[in-house]
Amino acid sequence: MTHLERSRHQQHPFHMVMPSPWPIVVSFALLSLALSTALTMHGYIGNMNMVYLALFVLLTSSILWFRDIVAEATYLGDHTMAVRKGINLGFLMFVLSEVLIFAGLFWAYFHSAMSPDVTLGACWPPVGIEAVQPTELPLLNTIILLSSGATVTYSHHALIAGNRNKALSGLLITFWLIVIFVTCQYIEYTNAAFTISDGVYGSVFYAGTGLHFLHMVMLAAMLGVNYWRMRNYHLTAGHHVGYETTIIYTHVLDVIWLFLYVVFYWWGV
């Protein structure tokens, strides 16, 4: 049913979502991914097959779910002004929850760093830990991430001004900057002198930077989807709520990374 036909029968601007299998499928896929990963890490499962299967189901169901959302927003006209306000509010609540998660990780870091136990050598980083230097890859990553914030803002302003070519160029540059950031972060992890199992320092370091790393992978996927949608004329100067939320997400991750860099890489070393 198109938006025009629905308006004859529906006296409110809200989207009455049709029954969909994807929320429950994604929920069970996430549960399976968490359980299989934990069981594999603790040796209860001898291989990674269950992890790969859960990840495949999660990615496939997420793609199909996003496909339906794009169809509802672009072709069916379900995302009215009231719906877009609700989406923006929900995304802001999501961002708040992410900030609180990282606040807990910073709390854990400061709890151990400001009063290191005697078992750690009464110092921070603990005895035997060779910390990552802040003037190496982390500094390059900081420059890359701040640059991505500038290019995505440039793309957004170009889209609002109706300059499609500049909007596409800025978005594409942002996407590749995020890919480079993720690659540099992976190189840093593979060359680090400590692992997540090296005491509280390794645990809290990889928990904080690793969680940010996963969010950056998600951000790269979101930017890629928005680039595809912009190429296909799904985004207009007045209606691009998905792109707006992605831009907010980019800036939030930029700020979180600045705190991670200052605390984990500079102050903590």
Curated annotation (Swiss-Prot):
Q: What is its EC number?
A: 7.1.1.9
Q: Which stretches of this protein does UniProt put in the Mitochondrial matrix compartment?
A: 1-22, 74-80, 162-164, 231-248
Residue ranges of coiled coil: none
GO terms (molecular function) for this protein are: cytochrome-c oxidase activity; ubiquinone binding
Checking InterPro entries in the record gives:
Cyt_c/ubiquinol_Oxase_su3 (IPR024791), Cyt_c_oxase_su3_dom (IPR033945), Cyt_c_oxidase-like_su3 (IPR000298), Cyt_c_oxidase_su3-like_sf (IPR035973), Cyt_c_oxidase_su3_a-hlx (IPR013833)
Q: Where are the transmembrane segments?
A: 23-41, 49-73, 81-114, 138-161, 165-188, 202-230, 249-265
Reaction(s) catalysed (UniProt annotation)? 4 Fe(II)-[cytochrome c] + O2 + 8 H(+)(in) = 4 Fe(III)-[cytochrome c] + 2 H2O + 4 H(+)(out)
Broad EC category: translocase
Designated name of the protein: Cytochrome c oxidase subunit 3
